[in-house]
Amino acid sequence: MSADRTRPFTYAAIDEDLAIHALGHGKLKDAYAFLAGQSNALAAINSPMSTNKGLVKREEIRKKLSANSYLGKWVNLRLVEYELLERGIRVPRTPNSKKKSPRWMKLGFHLFEELDKLGYAIYPNLLSEKQFFECQGEAAFWNLLGHAPLKEGSLEGCLQRQMVLFLAGMPVTNAMTFFEGITRHRLLNNQLPMDMVYSASELNALIAAYTAFLSGTQADKVIHIGAEEEGIIYLPDNPI
C-alpha cells in the first residue's frame, strides 16, 4: 500500500501465488475498509511509521556512522533514512514532529494508527494472523536493480519499474510490449499505448505487495534496515 502526495492511498493485494486480487485508489476510509475486511494479511505500507526520535543526533549512533559522509550535518531525519541516503537511495526525510510533516506523511501515520486499532500487529509476530510493516518503494526498486532507478513518475521510470516487477515474477505486462505497439503514425498522433503502463503510485503499491509476499513466504530474501525506536524498513534482497 502506498500513501503519496497526489492520490492519498493506492493499494494492491496479491496472494501466495503472486496473483493480483486488487489494485485501486482511494481515501483513508477506503484503505481502512479494505484492510478491515482481511482476516489473514501481511500489509506493507510505503510510508513512514513514525516521526524521527532524534537517533541520528545521539553520540553513540553518530560514532557508528561514516565519518566521511556528506550527510554528516543532517540530523532531522530517521536513522533508517540516513542509512538509505548514505547508500545513494533517494528517500524523503521524516521530521521530528507530525506538525512539521507533509500531508501525505500525516495520512500514513494515521493509517498505521488505524491498523493497530484493527488488530494488526507489527511484523514479525507469530501470534497474529494480521501484521504490517513499513517498506519503501524507491529503495525496493533500487535493491532489485542494483543501482538507482530512472526518474520516478517518468514514462521511462515507470516502464523500468514495471519490467523489474515482471522479471520478479509479478503478473504484470512485459514492459517491452509497450514498444511493440508504437508506430510512426501512432507516435505523431499522440496514440501511445499508455493503458498498458502502470502509474508510479500503482508501481509502489505493487512493489510493497511483492515485499510482503517475500516476507511471508521467503523471509531469507528480505533485509531490514533501521531501529525499532523509529521504524524498521523491509526491502527485497533478491536482485533480478
Regions found by a protein language model. Give the residues of each.
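RNase H-like (RuvC/DEDD) metal-dependent nuclease/polynucleotide-processing core
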Residues: 1-240
